[in-house]
Amino acid sequence: MADQLIRATAAEDGIRAVGVITTRLTEEARQRHKLSYVATAALGRTMAAGLLLASSMKQPQARVNIRIKGDGPLEGLFVDAGCDGTVRGYVYNPAIELPPNAKGKLDVGGAVGSQGYLYVIRDLGYGYPYSSTVELVSGEIAEDITHYLVTSEQTPSALVLGVFVTEAGVTAAGGVLIQVLPKAAQDEALVEKLESRISALSGFTPLLQRGLSLSEIFEQLLGDMGLTILPQRQLVRFHCRCSFDRMLGALKILGSDELQDMIDRDNGAEATCHFCGEVYQASSEQLAELIDELKAEAGG
């Protein structure tokens, strides 16, 4: 099943729902960063969450940044997701592995840690970005981002995220975000029914492994609540905006002395993109050209 995002409404537009499948892009991130099982789950959950949050933004260039800094051995992670369906990200300590938790599942909460902060930045592409910071609740990602949505955006929300990874790689990943808007929030019976449905879920990835599509998952959750699945399906993918030219621009900022030192010491330069793991190499000749450009710009 292709990585994709779909949107839906229910309860006469009083409920907003978004679902995303991110199996392939999570596997690409795992391979690019050489992630452990638990690091794959942590980053995969957060990339799915980033795409779900970004989906509510209207501007084509709008993006959501999620940064988590916890006291666990993973140390932290960063995700950049756009409403155009692109996402990238990295973890600070990609190789750490932990024993399964008490439920026999990957111990994402233990890896991230329960003490720390979740930072969310919404950037419309113009003006000042909107940023918010909340304390971590559990380090399990979904609970922490739900806490952010309820406290910072004052929107009752339920977020279910999952990543299933084996020795063969990621076989299922994605999530569902359901939000109760003000017009439906006063209907206690509706809210209780929705909470009961979500609590009864065994997780997101088991549904994908059973072969259910996002539409079928929505039917299971909201089918008797006036569900309307919007026709537009958006493809999502791992995509990094790094390039060789951007790398040269970053090197140029270092200045002539540092560039000359790289030429003398290393006969060139090598840089690795944090977001995607792509390695770029600049020759001594290319560094010399940057030095010439700096001299010309300085008028000498």
UniProtKB/Swiss-Prot annotation:
Gene Ontology MF terms: protein folding chaperone; unfolded protein binding
UniProt-listed SUPFAM superfamilies: Hsp33 domain, HSP33 redox switch-like
Database matches in CDD domains: Hsp33
GO terms for biological process, alphabetical: protein refolding
A matching Pfam family: HSP33
Primary site of residence: cytoplasm
Keywords assigned by UniProt, alphabetized: Chaperone, Cytoplasm, Disulfide bond, Redox-active center, Zinc
UniProt-listed NCBIfam families: PRK00114.1
PANTHER family named among the record's database cross-references: 33 KDA CHAPERONIN
Name of the featured protein: 33 kDa chaperonin
